[in-house]
């Protein structure tokens, strides 16, 4: 989750106005899709755990294999990016080799997943969410304490937030399509969809998560 502190600002700086709004929207679109399709898919496959299982039921074995391969490639790339971020950040703030921290985290994660499975992942996700919220509150508090609102607006405009160029619109549309298409294959979303208590829980979680993701990316992009 370390990307959330730097990526929105980078997108806003290089992509200008449309891009940051597109990036914020792309963070919410997976939850919009889950809100619409999640309850239906979960009802059709009550004992399911992944999107690939649903695809196999509806479209056959070949389609299931294609979805599984794409999901493995995507999740593998995502995992590499996460560990690369961890390694980079720890080497930037300490003298400890980042690769050692990444290995420690990987081994610890594998250990509790092998022992307790998805329930352990769900529990640690909740702890991580509390930590991320606390970190964001600290960052935003420091940010607002050091800058007046008028200064924030001035800096944001100087960074191109109010510049709406054609290339920025094209880039924003590309980001929305690319991120949404990729996140569909994130098995974490579907595991949580299938494990939800009922359709109401899926929709409530989608609304809260979607709004939270959109506002967080937008605020950090402006900052």
Explain the meaning of each model-derived region.
Residues 67, 164-180:
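Hydrophobic alpha-helical transmembrane segments
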Residues 56-61, 160-166:
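Helix-boundary and loop/linker segments of multi-pass membrane transporters
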Residues 10-14, 40-42, 84-93, 107-128, ...:
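Membrane-water interface regions at transmembrane-helix termini and the short interhelical loops
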Residues 123-126, 173, 204-211:
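Internal alpha-helical transmembrane segments of multi-pass membrane proteins, especially GPCRs
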Residues 1, 56-65, 128-142, 209-215:
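Small-residue-rich segments of transmembrane alpha-helices in multi-pass membrane proteins
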Residues 76-79, 83, 96-100, 104, ...:
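Hydrophobic alpha-helical segments and their helix-loop junctions in multi-pass secondary transporters
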Residues 1-47, 189-192, 199-223:
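Membrane-interface helix-loop-helix modules in multi-pass membrane proteins
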Residues 18-113, 178-179:
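Helix-loop-helix module between adjacent transmembrane segments
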């Amino acid at each position: 989750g370390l990307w959330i502190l730097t990526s929105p600002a980078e997108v806003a700086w290089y992509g200008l106005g449309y891009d940051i709004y597109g990036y914020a929207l792309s963070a919410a679109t997976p939850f919009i899709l889950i809100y619409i399709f999640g309850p239906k898919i979960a009802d059709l496959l009550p004992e399911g755990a992944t999107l690939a299982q649903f695809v196999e039921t509806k479209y056959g074995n070949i389609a299931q294999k294609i979805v599984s391969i794409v999901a493995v490639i995507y999740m593998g790339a995502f995992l590499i990016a996460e560990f690369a971020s961890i390694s980079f950040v720890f080497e930037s703030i300490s003298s400890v080799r980042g690769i050692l921290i990444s290995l420690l985290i990987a081994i610890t994660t594998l250990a509790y997943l092998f022992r307790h499975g998805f329930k352990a992942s769900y529990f640690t996700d909740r702890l991580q969410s509390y930590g991320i919220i606390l970190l964001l509150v600290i960052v935003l508090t420091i940010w607002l304490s050091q800058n007046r609102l008028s200064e924030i607006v001035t800096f944001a405009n100087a960074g191109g937030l109010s510049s709406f160029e054609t290339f920025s619109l094209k880039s924003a549309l590309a980001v929305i399509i690319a991120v949404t298409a990729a996140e569909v294959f994130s098995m974490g979303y579907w595991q949580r969809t299938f494990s939800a208590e009922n359709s109401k829980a899926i929709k409530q979680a989608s609304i809260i998560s979607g709004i939270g993701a959109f506002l967080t990316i937008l605020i950090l992009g402006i900052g």
